[in-house]
Regions:
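C-terminal, surface-exposed recognition/capping segments
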Residues: 31, 39, 46, 53-60, ...
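Generic alpha-helical propensity signal that fires on short helical segments
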Residues: 19, 69, 174-175
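Bacterial N-terminal signal peptides
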Residues: 9-18
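A short glycine-rich, aromatic-capped structural motif
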Residues: 38-131, 156, 160-165
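Bacterial Sec-dependent N-terminal signal peptides
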Residues: 18-39, 237
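Bacterial N-terminal signal peptides that target proteins for export
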Residues: 1-9
Length: 293
């Protein structure tokens, strides 16, 4: 097939996708900040946020933070590798409050490996959240090279905000989230507040437990790129064995976990648990947000 025919075929394929999905005329751009997905998500009755374009990543040897270039990107973790300040690969799972800023915790470096949960008290305070005091315990305080590269632009969602996104948001379509397999990666799709359900057909919407996660909402890379670039869908990728995303809130419940834990959003294929506990020393993903004006 010559170049002209290839180009014609590509254009026809794009037209088929647009018609097949019931695609509407391109909606006005929201002018999302650098490094953000162009969709708005309510975190309470009066406030919206943009999600970052991917999970947070860090390279110890260069002290560099960045967002994953694709929403479905996860770094295959090897628990037997010793990570220190000289490690020259990227990591994307962190103990709680390990922003790299010396905010008062014993362990504040992103590569910290202590299994003593008290070493990760934000600001050295057992009852402090990441956003308390100077805010420097939050990973979003850092310069992120593909996210505006300024301090204090991003932040981690609180426990209550995670719960609002999954359970309480009022959206145009009524859809808030769905399990999916995107480009062979398992994940949770979050629909923006103004999602139009005629654009693409999703099943098992707003269900935290499903029975066929491996064949539910299977989306190719091509279709996903068209959806998330224009319509602002967010994907929270997960490992097949499960993973968790940190909140900025410490565990303020008087339960058996006590102050050793912070709150998280955890998931495995087919299951979602919001507002659960995770020991502070455990390594979890971080997905940052930026407040909308």
């Amino acid at each position: 097939m010559n170049r002209t025919l290839k180009a014609t075929a590509a254009i026809m394929l794009m037209m088929v996708f647009a018609v097949g999905c019931g695609k509407q005329p391109m909606k006005p751009q929201k002018q999302a900040p650098e490094g953000a997905v162009d969709g708005l998500f309510s975190i309470n009755e009066n406030k919206q946020v943009y999600f970052s374009q991917g999970n947070l990543q860090y390279q110890p040897s260069s002290n560099t933070w960045q967002f994953a270039w694709n929403q479905y990107d996860c770094i295959d973790r090897n628990d037997y590798i010793v990570i220190d300040e000289n490690y020259d690969e990227w990591i994307d799972a962190f103990a709680w409050g390990t922003s790299g800023n010396n905010h008062g915790a014993v362990c504040y470096q992103p590569w910290s490996n202590s299994e003593n949960d008290a070493d990760y008290f934000a600001y050295g305070d057992s009852v402090a959240n990441l956003y308390d005091h100077t805010g420097q315990a939050d990973w979003g305080y850092n310069r992120i090279r593909n996210g505006g590269n300024q301090t204090g632009q991003w932040r981690t969602l609180t426990k209550d905000e995670w719960e609002y996104i999954f359970d309480k948001r009022t959206t145009t379509s009524g859809a808030r989230f769905a399990h999916a397999v995107v480009n062979n990666a398992f994940g949770i799709i979050l629909f923006p507040d103004d999602w139009d359900p005629t654009v693409y057909s999703f099943v098992e919407v707003n269900k935290k437990k499903i029975f066929s996660p491996f064949i539910t909402n299977v989306i190719s890379e091509t279709d996903w790129n068209a959806l998330h670039y224009q319509y602002g869908l967010v994907l929270l990728p997960i490992y097949q064995r499960g993973c968790a995303y940190w909140s900025s809130s410490y565990n303020d419940k008087n339960d058996e976990y006590g102050l050793n834990c912070a709150f998280e959003m955890s998931t495995l294929p087919g299951f979602i648990f919001v507002g659960t506990n995770e020991y502070r020393h455990n390594k979890c993903y971080v997905r940052l947000v930026q407040d909308a004006d």
